[in-house]
Amino acid sequence: MKVTFEQLKAAFNRVLISRGVDSETADACAEMFARTTESGVYSHGVNRFPRFIQQLENGDIIPDAQPKRITSLGAIEQWDAQRSIGNLTAKKMMDRAIELAADHGIGLVALRNANHWMRGGSYGWQAAEKGYIGICWTNSIAVMPPWGAKECRIGTNPLIVAIPSTPITMVDMSMSMFSYGMLEVNRLAGRQLPVDGGFDDEGNLTKEPGVIEKNRRILPMGYWKGSGMSLVLDMIATLLSDGASVAEVTEDNSDEYGISQIFIAIEVDKLIDGPTRDAKLQRIMDYVTSAERADENQAIRLPGHEFTTLLAENRRNGITVDDSVWAKIQAL
């Protein structure tokens, strides 16, 4: 089905206010959920909203909490999210990293005791729109087996890198082949995954999203490489924030909350002039996209460039929402 941005935001706002969230916070949170969905990231927008409300009702998310600065070391700051609303706090932390970068050339904010930030790419994009390189990542509850194991002991720990090119170039990737959100999107659409995304119950690689969602044997990105990246991203976030690791979140908490996150902004213009920056970035993009195609009907894509098109299409034609997901939200 199709809905407008206004309908989507109003639905989110209604549910948030009905759960006791104050009107200003509810409006800002609903806006971010709706913007994420409008951008085409359904898995971490509208599809994720019922799960967000469940955690709000369970007390994992404290809606009136505000992040608190703990330590300041020039370009590096350490903050405590105090289990505040994840997407609103993440936006504030990237804003703070940008402020630090404006003063020092680079800014790093390490955040502990945080909640799920929903679409991580929003915060990289936020920096790139202002001309900064944006880098951020988060740890999570253990939802992926390390390479060679059956049990979930590492997080998908998504990493975002956004570059202020025209259009913005951005990688937004979990350390698994697919996020659990994308498994859900494909399952709801009745699609197999385009490549193997995990193991079935017999230990064979599979493209069936529903099987992987159920048994939790999701495949690390690049096999052992994604497994290793997940581990070191967790270690860095834990140390810099003095926060909880994947092991602590999984073993000590009843659900995924109290996680650790990193936000980095780099002011490119302190290192290179604007015209030179733009020319260098354009040459890189042209060089890549001019390569001979393996399939003449399939263009060579650059990461993040599709979001401008998706946003325009959704504004023109309405936002696609799965019927079952919309029914869940209406019932909240």
Swiss-Prot record:
Binding site for NAD(+): I168, T169, M170, V171, D172, M173, S174, W224, K225, G304, H305, E306
Assigned GO CC terms: cytoplasm
NAD keyword on record: yes
EC annotation from Swiss-Prot or TrEMBL: 1.1.1.130
Matching InterPro entries: Diketo_gul_Rdtase (IPR023689), Mal/L-sulf/L-lact_DH-like_ah (IPR043144), Mal/L-sulf/L-lact_DH-like_NADP (IPR043143), Mal/L-sulfo/L-lacto_DH-like_sf (IPR036111), Malate/L-lactate_DH-like (IPR003767)
Organism taxonomic ancestry: Bacteria, Pseudomonadati, Pseudomonadota, Gammaproteobacteria, Enterobacterales
Keyword entries, A-Z: Cytoplasm, NAD, Oxidoreductase
Assembly mode: Homodimer.
Name of this chain's protein: 2,3-diketo-L-gulonate reductase
Enzyme class, broadest EC rank: oxidoreductase
Reaction(s) this enzyme catalyzes, per UniProt: 3-dehydro-L-gulonate + NAD(+) = 2,3-dioxo-L-gulonate + NADH + H(+); 3-dehydro-L-gulonate + NADP(+) = 2,3-dioxo-L-gulonate + NADPH + H(+)
Family to which the UniProt record says this protein belongs: Belongs to the LDH2/MDH2 oxidoreductase family. DlgD subfamily.
Pfam families, per database record: Ldh_2
Location within or outside the cell: Cytoplasm
Coiled-coil region(s): none
Active site: H44 (proton donor)
